[in-house]
């Protein structure tokens, strides 16, 4: 139909626009009905449709507004737009009459010259006249119907038969009109987008460091998918589901896609939150449709990513009734995936989650998710294989020491290593920008001084780069470099020019400080940067920690030969500031194990059960990061002695930690270090063998140890010392009695501050400077002074000694000595000293 264009510029009301649109819609439906009836007549007479005749007689099938009645439009408008029912009837009638006349006038202007259009205007009755006539017809029809019914009472025939036999032309016309309206309405049915269920392009060969997981998946999934006849002949039901769990970024989604690509079977990947719908029952229908599609594509794999979003625990964990229904529907659908109902073709479900404990217990039983596979944080060997696999398609220049990179990336998961490779590639790309930009420094002029501020002097880059932090090496390039490069090379680079672009080992080292591991973002620390070189003295304690933790991680086979398989626990206790936390960090670094540092009070929560959940979460994360060292600082706040005065919540926290340390859960590869100043306040059950069985007393350093500590501090901090500094004289000073390692660090720091004051503020004029001018005074005094001229002298140390006071008094030292004798550790210390000698 050629749509009639109306003069919509003359319309001033939204109601007018709405009525005109509905009139055109009615005309389209009438035209479609007439075309359909003409086509049926022509097929009955000639057997085929003659398109040429349709073009010649186009006006025969077109329905015009002059053929409509106001009453017909009134009924159609109320049926199609329910909002018009709120409009007053009189206003609607007048609007329809006015708009119908406008449309007829538009038709007359456009089609009046065509011979097929009958331009003889018939006088149209108004809508009020039509409604009055219709009411009269209804009243007359009612009277006639009553007369017919009363006339049949004297006859033997039934009333229903008599009524059925009557042929009311008005009723038939209404039925035909409704039928044509239904047929002529062009209903646009929303078609579902057919998703691609073909196997992914990836394969298991592209994955590295996951050999154990791949072997389990091929046994549980690959064998039933490729050879279901083995299970059918033996009558063994193959597994219906496998649950993959582990920290974010460890490769759960990647291995599911790679497995489907390796097996070359249809793969239905679903993001679990996409199943949830706002309408009641729609979410369950989506799950049923997904499983019906899976059965039609069998054998196939169905992958639910983040499945914990739709399967929470129903015992209070599910907040709404809809979540309970979704869990129940998923359980029912998985139970129906038997070999009999899938025609001997298995359908296996793979679920992925970061929180397996939040899933409903019914989902984790046998027959649903039969097996659970934990994807741990990769160790050093796994990281080496992952880096090699990720670098297969990279253009690498020279030999890259991936083994060293694997050592430098403890706590990194696959996603973190991918980010490292990408950042290294970014460094290489920026290098070619700087190489081809060829920017040279030019003299500064008054007109281009603003541009010169952005230019780079390549000759100075070598000296300046050594002073910058490597974390800033991959900062965005200056705009002038990019502009100059684009100006010099507007066309794509040639192959010869691109041959210089490659990724070097230095690019990886530059990119490494910029990558923050996922574990550190979630609040779990990785391996610290403290080594034994940063620890002064404490030789006896270092030896014990090396035998208890470092060597079992580095060389576990030696301990297994003598029957030692369970990891040990160590309690470090002593006065504050003696290096307990520093020792724990150094142990984690030396063993190259993952490190989780927990401040005792931070796990405590005022809500019931939250503290226990936090403890379980720490050990769950540690199991996924084996080998791992958990360091509990201020342990006495977390596990106080249980007695009648202890609250019930604190007792539950102690019990939870005790069961995690030596309960039914496997603690293989998890080493625990506790630190406290008050070992007498810790519950005795924590100190029994199997938990924190080794207690090491970190006492105040003696004279030789103090000398070693202060030398280590000045060396590690890079403190510039004068030749007259005599550390032995400083240590022998009576004011250094009872000094701990923290006190000695404060002494070195205070002496450095005094050296700065002596260099910058030699006079007392600074006291008269106003507060708001203090920064300016400092800048004026520091002009022309370099850092190399600042030297810490012996007088600075003597002045600092007068300010620093020991953190442990004589009374506190005697208390710790008595506590050491009370715990019976003196003999152990003597034995350790003899072993050292």
UniProtKB/Swiss-Prot annotation:
The keyword Repeat applies. The keyword Chaperone does not apply. ATP binds at residues 246-253, 574-581. Keywords: ATP-binding, Nucleotide-binding, Nucleus, Phosphoprotein, Repeat, Ribosome biogenesis. Residues 149-163 have a biased composition (Polar residues). It is found in: Nucleus, Nucleolus. Coiled coil: none annotated. Involved in ribosome biogenesis. Seems to be required for restructuring nucleoplasmic 60S pre-ribosomal particles to make them competent for nuclear export. Present with 4490 molecules/cell in log phase SD medium. Belongs to the AAA ATPase family. This is Ribosome biogenesis ATPase RIX7. It comes from Saccharomyces cerevisiae (strain ATCC 204508 / S288c).
